[in-house]
UniProtKB/Swiss-Prot annotation:
Keywords: ATP-binding, Cytoplasm, Fatty acid biosynthesis, Fatty acid metabolism, Lipid biosynthesis, Lipid metabolism, Nucleotide-binding, Transferase
Primary location recorded for the protein, binned into one broad class: cytoplasm
Origin species: Rhizobium rhizogenes (strain K84 / ATCC BAA-868)
SUPFAM superfamilies: ClpP/crotonase (SSF52096)
Function: Component of the acetyl coenzyme A carboxylase (ACC) complex. First, biotin carboxylase catalyzes the carboxylation of biotin on its carrier protein (BCCP) and then the CO(2) group is transferred by the carboxyltransferase to acetyl-CoA to form malonyl-CoA.
Record lineage: Bacteria, Pseudomonadati, Pseudomonadota, Alphaproteobacteria, Hyphomicrobiales
Name the record gives this protein: Acetyl-coenzyme A carboxylase carboxyl transferase subunit alpha
Family stated for the protein in its record: Belongs to the AccA family.
Length: 317
C-alpha cells in the first residue's frame, strides 16, 4: 500500500481508479479494461512529472521523510558485500541508530556507516528513529579510527532529523561526541564520501558528513535545524514550518548553488520510494566515480582538501 503525501492527491485519485479497474477485470474476465488503464497510467506519469517538477522546499521535506523511502539497511544490502557490522562504543553501550562496519564496495574494502531510521514501529524504536545518542557517535569514531589505521575509504549515508536531545544523552556528552566525530572526520588521511539519502539534520548529520565529496539525493534535505524547529525559534509558531523551509535553503538545488555539496543524485519520478533499486544503483555509481577520482591523492592531500573545503564554507557564506 502506497503512502501518499498531501500534495499527491491527483496521483492518488488516478492510481485509485487504476486499482479499481484492474480489480474489476480480475473478477470478470469478460471485461477488458486494458485501454482505459493504459490511458490512466499515462495521466499518472504526466501528473507526477508536473507535480515533482515544481516541488517547494516543504514538499521536498515531506518526500525526504517518506516512511517508504529506502534507508541505510536497503543501501547496505544492495551496494555492499561481506558487510560486517560492529557494535558498541567501548565506553557505555550500543546505539542502533548508527549502523557501522566494514564491507566490500564493488570489490574494494571500505568502512561504512550511517543512520538507520527503521521501517516499522518495532525497528523505529530499536533505531530510535535515526536519532543517535553519544554512544552512536563514539561508535562512529571507532570505525573512523580503524579505517584510517587500515587505510580504508569511508562511505557515510546520512539520514537523521538530528542527534537525540534527551537528558541522558546530554548527561553523557552528546555535544562532545558530535564534536569528536566531526574532528575525527577532518583528520582522516583516507577518502570520505558522504551521501545524504533522506534528512540531514543539524550536528547529528554533519558529525559523519565531513567528506571529501558530499552528495545529496534530489529530494533530500540538509539543514542546521528542522523547519519546525526553526519556525518555533524564529516565530514561536511551528505551523510556519513551510515558510521556514523556504527561507532556510535546505534543498539539494539550493545547497549545490551555495557550494555546500558537490553533486545531486537524481531520483526516480515520484521519489526514491517509488523505485528504490534505481536510486540506490545511481548512488552507487556516484560513490564509485568519487572513489576513483580521489584514489590517486595522498593522505595528506585528502586531509588538507577536506579541511579547506569546510573552512571555505564558513568564510564564504
Amino acid at each position: 500500500m502506497h503512502n501518499y503525501l498531501d500534495f499527491e492527491k491527483p496521483i492518488s485519485d488516478l492510481e485509485g481508479k487504476i486499482h479499481e479497474l484492474k480489480k474489476l477485470a480480475s473478477e470478470d474476465e469478460s471485461i477488458d479494461t486494458s485501454d482505459e488503464v493504459g490511458r490512466l497510467e499515462i495521466r499518472v506519469r504526466e501528473s507526477m512529472a508536473d507535480i515533482y517538477s515544481k516541488l517547494n522546499a516543504w514538499q521536498k521535506t515531506q518526500v525526504a521523510r517518506h516512511p517508504q523511502r529506502p534507508h541505510f539497511v536497503d543501501y547496505a544490502k544492495a551496494l555492499f558485500t561481506e558487510f560486517t557490522p560492529l557494535a558498541g562504543d567501548r565506553k557505555f553501550s550500543e546505539d542502533a541508530a548508527i549502523q557501522a562496519g566494514f564491507a566490500r564496495f564493488r570489490g574494494q574494502p571500505v568502512a561504512v556507516l550511517g543512520q538507520e531510521k527503521g521501517n516499522d514501529t518495532k525497528s523505529r524504536l530499536k533505531h530510535n528513529f535515526g536519532s543517535a545518542r553519544p554512544e552512536g557517535y563514539r561508535k562512529a569514531i571507532r570505525i573512523l579510527e580503524m579505517a584510517d589505521r587500515f587505510q580504508l575509504p569511508v562511505i557515510t549515508l546520512v539520514d537523521t532529523a538530528g542527534a537525540y536531545p534527551g537528558v541522558g544523552a546530554e548527561e553523557r556528552g552528546q555535544a562532545e561526541a558530535i564534536a569528536r566525530s566531526t574532528e575525527m572526520c577532518l583528520g582522516l588521511k583516507v577518502p570520505i564520501i558522504s551521501v545524504v539519502i533522506g534528512e540531514g539534520g543539524s550536528g547529528g548529520a554533519i558529525a559523519i558528513a565531513v567528506g571529501n565529496r558530499v552528495y545529496m539525493l534530489e529530494h533530500s534535505i540538509y539543514s542546521v535545524i528542522s523547519p519546525e524547529g526553526a519556525a518555533s525559534i524564529l516565530w514561536r509558531d511551528s505551523t510556519r514550518a513551510k515558510e521556514a523551509a523556504t527561507n532556510m535553503k535546505i534543498t539539494a538545488e539550493d545547497l549545490k548553488g551555495l557550494g555546500i555539496i558537490d553533486g545531486i543524485i537524481p531520483e526516480p519520478l515520484g521519489g526514491a520510494h517509488r523505485d528504490p533499486q534505481t536510486v540506490i544503483a545511481a548512488a552507487g555509481d556516484v560513490i564509485s566515480n568519487a572513489l576513483g577520482e580521489l584514489s590517486s591523492r595522498s593522505g595528506e592531500q585528502l586531509r588538507s582538501d577536506r579541511r579547506q573545503k569546510f573552512l571555505n564554507m564558513g568564510r564564504n557564506l
